[in-house]
Amino acid sequence: MKMKKLHKVLLAIVLAWVVGVAEAQNVSPVDFMRFNPYQINANPATDLPYESVMSILIGNFNLGMQNTSLRYDNLFEFDEQGRPALINLRQFANSVKKDNYLGFNASVDLFTLFRRTKHGLLTINWGVKTQGDARLNDGLFKLLGYGNGAFVGEGNPAVVDMSLNVTGYQELAVGYQMNVTEKLSLGWRGKLLFGAANVTTDAFNAQLTTDADSYALRIREHIAMKASLPSVFYIDESGYPATQGYFRVLDLFKNPGFGVDLAAEYRFNEQFSAVAAVTDLGFIHWRLNNFDLTSNINDAGQFYDHGDFLYNGIGVDQLQLITNDEDYREKFLDSLKLYFPLEFGQMGKYNTMLNTNLLLRANYDVTPCNRFSIQAQGRFMGSGFRPALTLAYCGSFWNNVNVCATYTMMPHSYDNIGLGFSWMMATCNVYLTTNNLIGFFKPLNSSSINAQVGIVFNLWMPERRFIDESGKPEYLE
């Protein structure tokens, strides 16, 4: 019964990762497309060529994943027909990096409205988001590939270290963009945040040491996680998570938070411009249905030794009982579980930070309709700082077509060739982009896959603006 309850909790953690948008280290061609209103997400100071914009539900869909080094082709040996024939854990262990990063993102913007005022552009946006990432070191893969025989001696432990950070929330953003002078533009957005779910690891590590003389196994582990999940989950009298079977929508608004986006854009002349931006600077205060999970080696009998699990082997008689007596085997396995307890408990309020993003960009306009850009970007994730360097070209044709090509370099990821296309038809802008064309042909062997599509409506036509010969946005006649 307890295992069934635990499975439900694990399922909830996975769902919290999958639902919404994970703002991982994704650089999208949308960020550079001058006709796409959603470029303002990366640069709130940009002067959009529109009088007004609106979208409901269909404005922005985003799907993607990040995987620095875990590759399908490295896990298997293949037959002559190219089908997996054998799992090769040692080959897989040799292929991973010292630190491996995984992420997933899927997004929907529920409502967007931009409206130009006398002095600038008012922006309103409501969306559902998650920010999620996981980090795994190579210790677990080395242990599976080579066994404990590769870790003999006190100075040579197998170290398994992992971290997981997932946050699901709603975001209501209100902002303003203004042209301070002909050369300087500023932009900001204030964000009201409403947390839906959070899972964070403070510690998730283990050490396994093999004695050089007796080959006894010594295991030390420490797990500390905290979570805030919807009210459908609670800790029952046995100390395990359980479900109530119903969900209260109002709970989605009981974990408040706040964030800001800030940006400045400066045009040196008609060719050169520069952008600096800080986005997703904020926090969420978790106060509803919080609990923690901890695990340390427990003193449950003969295998406990000064805080460690020490396994010296078992006798022949005991081995025969384990092999032949089902009841004895179940009791023996249950006794081993007592050494590795999972303890759940209610906990107080806590805060988590958003994954703040820093951006520096330089633009060179060859002509008013052809722009080259170079961008340095970095995001502070729960598992560390994730930098990226992007080269981009964006062309505007016939005043209604945008084509954008990007190349992005990230740690352990150098094959990210992106392409974006948008077409403005009367009162709507249809766009389709990806940050990695190669990834669509080899999804299980790519470090990054992303697709972003949407339809945005340009209201109050014919007041839509365009880029004139001087490179400045102007109204259509």
Segments from the language model and where they lie:
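N-terminal, post-signal peptide beta-strand-biased segments of exported outer-membrane/organellar beta-barrel
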Residues: 23-130, 134
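Solvent-exposed loop/turn segments connecting transmembrane beta-strands
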Residues: 33-38, 352-356, 365, 371, ...
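Residues that define the transmembrane beta-barrel architecture of outer-membrane proteins
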Residues: 38-40, 104-109, 166-172, 256-260, ...
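Residues on the lipid-exposed face of transmembrane beta-strands in outer-membrane beta-barrel proteins
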Residues: 44-46, 106-115, 124, 172-178, ...
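Repeated loop/turn-to-beta-strand initiation elements of outer-membrane beta-barrel proteins
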Residues: 52-54, 120-122, 183-186, 271-274, ...
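Transmembrane beta-barrel strands of outer-membrane/channel proteins
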Residues: 54-67, 124-130, 188-194, 221-232, ...
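Outer-membrane beta-barrel proteins
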Residues: 65-69, 132-137, 195-201, 211-212, ...
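Outer-membrane beta-barrel translocator/channel fold
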Residues: 98-102, 135-168, 228-234, 406-477
